[in-house]
């Protein structure tokens, strides 16, 4: 970075950092745009900005997963409005690698969450435009840190509920919630075991009108499945809970929030909170290294030739790999 660019960089960060720290939503949006950029100078600015923000601010990070049709946008708006009305500052972020191809879930949801998006104590950010999960997850994780630095009390991290996005979200949240719609036994069989194993709370939405009886049965089915599947590893005497809400009617939202707070408080008091966040930081450190190494490997001009040598049998896979690793290190 030349002297002129460095001066502009430092000046820009000195102006942006205090605005973000004061909770300015426009400044926060600009900061997240820097994080999402693929330009090296923008990435450097973003790193400097993250380092300049106040330390020690911690939001409750809540991961929300649910496939299309469960009423996720309705739930997020109703839940978010309940929180801001209780005096909480709420940010909504997304991990959706499909957004570059399909428009993503939250891109449309932002227009439907009109009340929450207009509220001065709320901030909603669509998924970044990278089409691969690694890039989206990394940018979202950094956006979470920005939101904490901006003083938000709760960060809702939404995932579309397909692929490996749930695992990525679980590695950046304090409480992971699986949102479901009322369904029969066949649909229960279709829920992936993996997501059931990481969920801290299952919330059955749309528990109203003609669907209320079905929601009651669905909730009971999942509660039973959770008891058979696992116990909470941090507390062997308890199981993840399943509960019903109606985002349309507003029923059950307070109870769900109280359960999330209770779990977070228990983890904070037991030391699990700090250990979990430390493990997550280490996980993302390794991910940053892995993605950085992959990028450097992809930029090597001799990589294709080495791969051709391996295909043709002129070199062994181990030998060719060692050549690359020796050059890198």
Residue ranges and their predicted role:
Residues 2-6:
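Extreme N-terminal basic, low-complexity initiation segments
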Residues 9-10:
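Short, positively charged and aromatic/hydrophobic N-terminal segments
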Residues 14-70, 79-165, 172-179, 185-187:
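Nucleotide-state-sensitive switch-loop elements of NTP-binding domains
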Residues 75:
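Hydrophobic positions on the alpha1 helix immediately C-terminal to the Walker A/P-loop
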Residues 126-127, 178-181, 203-206, 244:
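Conserved beta-strand segments of the P-loop GTPase G domain that flank and frequently precede/overlap
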Residues 201, 207-266:
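Canonical P-loop GTPase G-domain recognition
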